Curated annotation (Swiss-Prot):
Residues 284-298 have a biased composition (Basic and acidic residues). Residues 284-305 are annotated as: Disordered. The lineage of its organism: Bacteria, Bacillati, Actinomycetota, Actinomycetes, Frankiales. NCBIfam families: mycothiol_MshB. It catalyses: 1D-myo-inositol 2-acetamido-2-deoxy-alpha-D-glucopyranoside + H2O = 1D-myo-inositol 2-amino-2-deoxy-alpha-D-glucopyranoside + acetate. One of its GO terms (molecular function) is N-acetylglucosaminylinositol deacetylase activity. It comes from Parafrankia sp. (strain EAN1pec). HAMAP family: MshB (MF_01696). Belongs to the MshB deacetylase family. It comes from the Bacteria. This is 1D-myo-inositol 2-acetamido-2-deoxy-alpha-D-glucopyranoside deacetylase. Pfam families: PIG-L. Its EC number is 3.5.1.103.
Amino acid sequence: MTQSAETVLPPRRVLFVHAHPDDEVISTGVTMASYAARPDTHVTLVTCTLGEVGEVLVPELINLRSDLGDQLGGYRIGELDRSCAELGVTDHRFLGGAGRWRDSGMIDTPANDDPRCLWRADLDEASAALVQVVREVRPQVLVTYDENGAYGHPDHIRAHDVSVRAFADAANPDFAPEAGQPWQISKFYETATPKSFVQAGIEYFRESGGESPFGPAESADDIPLAVPDELITTEIQADEYLPAKVAAMRAHRTQMAVDGFFFALADGIGKRAWAAEHFVLTRGERGPGTEPGAHETDLFAGLPL
Protein backbone atom coordinates (compact mmCIF):
# COMPACT_ATOMS: atom_id res chain seq x y z
CA MET A 1 0.00 0.00 0.00
CA THR A 2 1.24 3.48 -0.87
CA GLN A 3 -0.27 6.61 0.59
CA SER A 4 -1.64 9.14 -1.88
CA ALA A 5 -0.66 12.79 -1.73
CA GLU A 6 -4.10 13.57 -0.26
CA THR A 7 -3.85 11.02 2.54
CA VAL A 8 -3.90 12.55 6.01
CA LEU A 9 -1.85 10.32 8.27
CA PRO A 10 -2.19 10.02 12.05
CA PRO A 11 0.06 12.26 14.18
CA ARG A 12 2.37 9.43 15.30
CA ARG A 13 4.21 7.55 12.55
CA VAL A 14 6.77 4.76 12.82
CA LEU A 15 8.78 3.06 10.06
CA PHE A 16 10.14 -0.48 10.44
CA VAL A 17 12.87 -1.58 8.00
CA HIS A 18 13.40 -5.34 7.78
CA ALA A 19 15.45 -7.58 5.53
CA HIS A 20 13.13 -10.48 4.64
CA PRO A 21 9.54 -11.61 5.08
CA ASP A 22 9.23 -13.08 8.63
CA ASP A 23 11.82 -10.70 10.15
CA GLU A 24 9.06 -8.22 10.92
CA VAL A 25 7.43 -10.58 13.40
CA ILE A 26 10.44 -12.15 15.10
CA SER A 27 11.86 -9.04 16.74
CA THR A 28 9.08 -6.47 16.36
CA GLY A 29 5.79 -8.39 16.10
CA VAL A 30 4.08 -7.27 19.30
CA THR A 31 5.48 -3.76 18.88
CA MET A 32 4.06 -3.42 15.39
CA ALA A 33 0.71 -4.92 16.40
CA SER A 34 0.35 -2.69 19.45
CA TYR A 35 1.06 0.49 17.50
CA ALA A 36 -1.04 -0.58 14.49
CA ALA A 37 -4.02 -0.94 16.83
CA ARG A 38 -3.80 2.71 17.89
CA PRO A 39 -5.89 5.16 15.84
CA ASP A 40 -3.32 7.91 16.46
CA THR A 41 -0.39 5.88 15.06
CA HIS A 42 0.54 4.87 11.51
CA VAL A 43 2.83 1.87 11.01
CA THR A 44 4.84 1.45 7.82
CA LEU A 45 6.84 -1.70 7.07
CA VAL A 46 9.56 -1.75 4.42
CA THR A 47 10.95 -5.18 3.54
CA CYS A 48 14.20 -5.10 1.59
CA THR A 49 14.05 -8.45 -0.24
CA LEU A 50 11.61 -11.27 -0.98
CA GLY A 51 13.68 -13.80 0.95
CA GLU A 52 14.31 -15.86 -2.18
CA VAL A 53 17.22 -17.84 -0.70
CA GLY A 54 15.47 -18.90 2.50
CA GLU A 55 14.95 -22.50 3.47
CA VAL A 56 11.68 -24.35 2.85
CA LEU A 57 10.36 -26.34 5.79
CA VAL A 58 7.21 -27.62 4.05
CA PRO A 59 8.04 -30.83 2.12
CA GLU A 60 5.35 -30.36 -0.53
CA LEU A 61 6.76 -26.90 -1.31
CA ILE A 62 10.40 -27.96 -1.56
CA ASN A 63 10.57 -27.09 -5.28
CA LEU A 64 10.19 -23.42 -4.41
CA ARG A 65 13.82 -23.41 -3.22
CA SER A 66 16.28 -21.13 -4.98
CA ASP A 67 18.37 -24.10 -6.14
CA LEU A 68 15.32 -25.80 -7.64
CA GLY A 69 12.36 -23.86 -9.04
CA ASP A 70 13.50 -20.55 -7.53
CA GLN A 71 9.92 -19.49 -6.84
CA LEU A 72 10.19 -18.95 -3.09
CA GLY A 73 10.24 -15.15 -3.25
CA GLY A 74 6.85 -14.92 -4.88
CA TYR A 75 5.38 -17.39 -2.41
CA ARG A 76 6.73 -15.44 0.53
CA ILE A 77 4.93 -12.30 -0.63
CA GLY A 78 1.72 -14.11 0.24
CA GLU A 79 3.11 -15.20 3.60
CA LEU A 80 4.08 -11.62 4.37
CA ASP A 81 0.62 -10.37 3.39
CA ARG A 82 -0.94 -12.82 5.85
CA SER A 83 1.55 -11.87 8.57
CA CYS A 84 0.77 -8.17 8.14
CA ALA A 85 -2.94 -8.92 8.31
CA GLU A 86 -2.44 -10.70 11.64
CA LEU A 87 -0.43 -7.74 12.96
CA GLY A 88 -2.91 -5.18 11.68
CA VAL A 89 -0.31 -3.51 9.45
CA THR A 90 -1.86 -2.08 6.29
CA ASP A 91 1.05 -0.05 4.90
CA HIS A 92 3.71 -2.40 3.60
CA ARG A 93 6.21 -1.83 0.81
CA PHE A 94 9.25 -3.58 -0.65
CA LEU A 95 12.39 -1.46 -0.91
CA GLY A 96 12.54 -0.20 -4.49
CA GLY A 97 9.55 -2.39 -5.38
CA ALA A 98 9.09 -6.15 -5.10
CA GLY A 99 12.12 -8.00 -6.43
CA ARG A 100 14.38 -4.96 -6.88
CA TRP A 101 17.02 -6.48 -4.61
CA ARG A 102 17.44 -10.20 -4.07
CA ASP A 103 18.07 -12.12 -0.86
CA SER A 104 21.85 -12.36 -0.34
CA GLY A 105 21.85 -15.63 1.61
CA MET A 106 23.96 -16.32 4.67
CA ILE A 107 27.44 -14.84 4.90
CA ASP A 108 30.19 -16.48 2.81
CA THR A 109 27.78 -18.31 0.51
CA PRO A 110 27.63 -18.05 -3.31
CA ALA A 111 24.42 -16.00 -3.09
CA ASN A 112 26.53 -13.12 -1.72
CA ASP A 113 28.08 -12.74 -5.18
CA ASP A 114 24.82 -12.34 -7.09
CA PRO A 115 24.89 -8.80 -8.55
CA ARG A 116 21.14 -8.55 -7.92
CA CYS A 117 21.42 -9.13 -4.17
CA LEU A 118 21.00 -6.51 -1.47
CA TRP A 119 24.55 -7.11 -0.23
CA ARG A 120 25.79 -5.79 -3.60
CA ALA A 121 23.31 -2.92 -3.82
CA ASP A 122 24.51 0.58 -4.57
CA LEU A 123 24.03 2.39 -1.27
CA ASP A 124 23.00 5.66 -2.94
CA GLU A 125 20.27 3.92 -4.92
CA ALA A 126 19.02 1.89 -1.97
CA SER A 127 19.00 4.96 0.27
CA ALA A 128 17.07 6.93 -2.34
CA ALA A 129 14.43 4.20 -2.42
CA LEU A 130 14.01 4.40 1.35
CA VAL A 131 14.17 8.19 1.37
CA GLN A 132 11.17 8.24 -0.95
CA VAL A 133 9.16 6.32 1.66
CA VAL A 134 10.44 8.49 4.51
CA ARG A 135 9.51 11.74 2.78
CA GLU A 136 6.08 10.40 1.90
CA VAL A 137 5.16 8.95 5.30
CA ARG A 138 7.22 11.38 7.45
CA PRO A 139 7.87 9.04 10.38
CA GLN A 140 9.15 10.39 13.68
CA VAL A 141 10.62 6.96 14.50
CA LEU A 142 12.64 4.43 12.47
CA VAL A 143 13.35 0.89 13.67
CA THR A 144 15.86 -1.52 12.12
CA TYR A 145 18.83 -3.72 13.13
CA ASP A 146 22.21 -2.89 14.63
CA GLU A 147 25.39 -2.61 12.57
CA ASN A 148 26.00 -6.36 12.90
CA GLY A 149 22.54 -7.19 11.60
CA ALA A 150 21.82 -8.90 14.95
CA TYR A 151 23.36 -12.22 13.91
CA GLY A 152 25.51 -11.22 10.95
CA HIS A 153 23.21 -11.88 8.00
CA PRO A 154 24.37 -9.74 5.05
CA ASP A 155 20.87 -8.46 4.34
CA HIS A 156 20.32 -7.44 7.96
CA ILE A 157 23.61 -5.57 7.92
CA ARG A 158 22.69 -3.90 4.65
CA ALA A 159 19.23 -2.97 5.94
CA HIS A 160 20.97 -1.20 8.81
CA ASP A 161 23.40 0.56 6.48
CA VAL A 162 20.61 1.71 4.16
CA SER A 163 18.55 2.94 7.12
CA VAL A 164 21.46 4.93 8.55
CA ARG A 165 22.08 6.55 5.18
CA ALA A 166 18.40 7.30 4.64
CA PHE A 167 18.13 8.80 8.13
CA ALA A 168 20.64 11.45 7.03
CA ASP A 169 19.71 11.67 3.36
CA ALA A 170 15.99 12.20 3.97
CA ALA A 171 16.75 15.44 5.82
CA ASN A 172 19.17 16.70 3.18
CA PRO A 173 17.39 18.99 0.67
CA ASP A 174 20.14 18.36 -1.88
CA PHE A 175 19.63 14.58 -1.86
CA ALA A 176 17.10 13.24 -4.37
CA PRO A 177 14.90 16.37 -4.49
CA GLU A 178 12.56 14.46 -6.80
CA ALA A 179 11.73 12.17 -3.84
CA GLY A 180 9.84 14.91 -2.00
CA GLN A 181 10.34 17.49 0.71
CA PRO A 182 13.11 16.84 3.27
CA TRP A 183 12.10 15.14 6.49
CA GLN A 184 14.09 14.70 9.71
CA ILE A 185 13.37 11.49 11.60
CA SER A 186 13.56 12.17 15.34
CA LYS A 187 14.49 8.77 16.79
CA PHE A 188 16.44 5.81 15.38
CA TYR A 189 16.13 2.47 17.16
CA GLU A 190 17.94 -0.82 16.72
CA THR A 191 16.34 -4.11 17.70
CA ALA A 192 18.05 -5.94 20.54
CA THR A 193 17.91 -9.29 22.32
CA PRO A 194 18.92 -8.89 25.99
CA LYS A 195 21.54 -11.22 27.41
CA SER A 196 19.13 -12.21 30.16
CA PHE A 197 16.64 -13.45 27.55
CA VAL A 198 19.31 -15.43 25.69
CA GLN A 199 20.60 -16.94 28.94
CA ALA A 200 17.09 -18.04 29.88
CA GLY A 201 16.77 -19.68 26.48
CA ILE A 202 20.11 -21.48 26.78
CA GLU A 203 19.13 -22.84 30.18
CA TYR A 204 15.68 -23.90 29.00
CA PHE A 205 16.99 -25.93 26.06
CA ARG A 206 19.75 -27.45 28.19
CA GLU A 207 17.27 -28.59 30.82
CA SER A 208 14.60 -29.74 28.35
CA GLY A 209 17.03 -31.60 26.11
CA GLY A 210 15.70 -29.86 23.02
CA GLU A 211 17.88 -28.77 20.11
CA SER A 212 19.06 -25.29 20.97
CA PRO A 213 19.21 -22.49 18.40
CA PHE A 214 22.17 -21.24 20.43
CA GLY A 215 24.23 -24.34 19.65
CA PRO A 216 26.60 -25.64 22.33
CA ALA A 217 26.91 -22.25 24.06
CA GLU A 218 26.71 -22.41 27.85
CA SER A 219 26.52 -18.67 28.36
CA ALA A 220 24.91 -15.70 26.65
CA ASP A 221 28.39 -14.15 26.69
CA ASP A 222 29.21 -16.54 23.84
CA ILE A 223 26.30 -15.38 21.65
CA PRO A 224 27.16 -12.30 19.54
CA LEU A 225 23.58 -11.12 19.16
CA ALA A 226 23.02 -10.95 22.93
CA VAL A 227 23.03 -7.31 24.06
CA PRO A 228 24.04 -6.45 27.65
CA ASP A 229 20.86 -5.63 29.52
CA GLU A 230 22.22 -2.30 30.70
CA LEU A 231 22.46 -1.08 27.09
CA ILE A 232 18.76 -1.62 26.42
CA THR A 233 16.99 1.73 26.35
CA THR A 234 13.46 0.71 25.47
CA GLU A 235 11.10 -2.17 26.21
CA ILE A 236 7.69 -2.66 24.65
CA GLN A 237 5.67 -5.09 26.75
CA ALA A 238 2.40 -5.88 25.00
CA ASP A 239 1.04 -9.18 26.32
CA GLU A 240 -2.34 -8.73 24.67
CA TYR A 241 -0.70 -8.75 21.23
CA LEU A 242 1.25 -11.99 21.70
CA PRO A 243 -1.53 -14.01 19.99
CA ALA A 244 -1.17 -11.74 16.96
CA LYS A 245 2.60 -12.28 16.96
CA VAL A 246 2.20 -16.06 17.15
CA ALA A 247 -0.40 -16.04 14.37
CA ALA A 248 1.90 -13.90 12.22
CA MET A 249 4.73 -16.35 12.82
CA ARG A 250 2.52 -19.21 11.70
CA ALA A 251 1.77 -17.29 8.51
CA HIS A 252 5.42 -17.81 7.50
CA ARG A 253 5.01 -21.55 7.25
CA THR A 254 7.86 -22.11 4.80
CA GLN A 255 10.24 -20.63 7.38
CA MET A 256 8.90 -21.56 10.82
CA ALA A 257 7.97 -25.08 11.88
CA VAL A 258 5.09 -25.23 14.35
CA ASP A 259 7.29 -27.43 16.53
CA GLY A 260 10.34 -25.23 15.97
CA PHE A 261 12.46 -23.43 18.52
CA PHE A 262 10.57 -20.10 18.37
CA PHE A 263 7.40 -21.72 19.65
CA ALA A 264 9.30 -23.97 22.06
CA LEU A 265 11.11 -20.96 23.47
CA ALA A 266 7.85 -19.10 24.00
CA ASP A 267 6.49 -22.05 25.97
CA GLY A 268 9.73 -22.62 27.84
CA ILE A 269 10.67 -19.21 29.17
CA GLY A 270 7.16 -17.90 29.51
CA LYS A 271 4.83 -16.18 27.13
CA ARG A 272 5.11 -12.85 28.93
CA ALA A 273 8.85 -12.75 28.19
CA TRP A 274 8.10 -13.50 24.53
CA ALA A 275 5.65 -10.58 24.50
CA ALA A 276 8.42 -8.12 25.42
CA GLU A 277 10.55 -6.61 22.65
CA HIS A 278 13.67 -4.57 23.21
CA PHE A 279 15.45 -1.74 21.46
CA VAL A 280 18.49 0.50 21.71
CA LEU A 281 18.03 4.18 20.85
CA THR A 282 21.12 5.18 18.85
CA ARG A 283 20.01 8.53 17.40
CA GLY A 284 17.71 11.02 19.08
CA GLU A 285 16.87 11.77 22.70
CA ARG A 286 15.43 9.40 25.29
CA GLY A 287 12.09 10.32 26.74
CA PRO A 288 12.25 12.60 29.80
CA GLY A 289 11.84 11.11 33.23
CA THR A 290 13.48 7.81 32.30
CA GLU A 291 15.52 7.01 35.39
CA PRO A 292 18.98 5.41 35.07
CA GLY A 293 18.50 1.70 34.55
CA ALA A 294 14.85 2.14 33.57
CA HIS A 295 13.46 1.68 30.09
CA GLU A 296 11.36 3.82 27.84
CA THR A 297 8.03 2.09 27.30
CA ASP A 298 7.04 4.00 24.17
CA LEU A 299 9.08 4.52 21.00
CA PHE A 300 7.61 8.01 20.78
CA ALA A 301 8.62 8.97 24.33
CA GLY A 302 9.69 12.60 24.58
CA LEU A 303 8.43 13.65 21.17
CA PRO A 304 6.19 16.74 21.00
CA LEU A 305 3.14 15.06 19.51
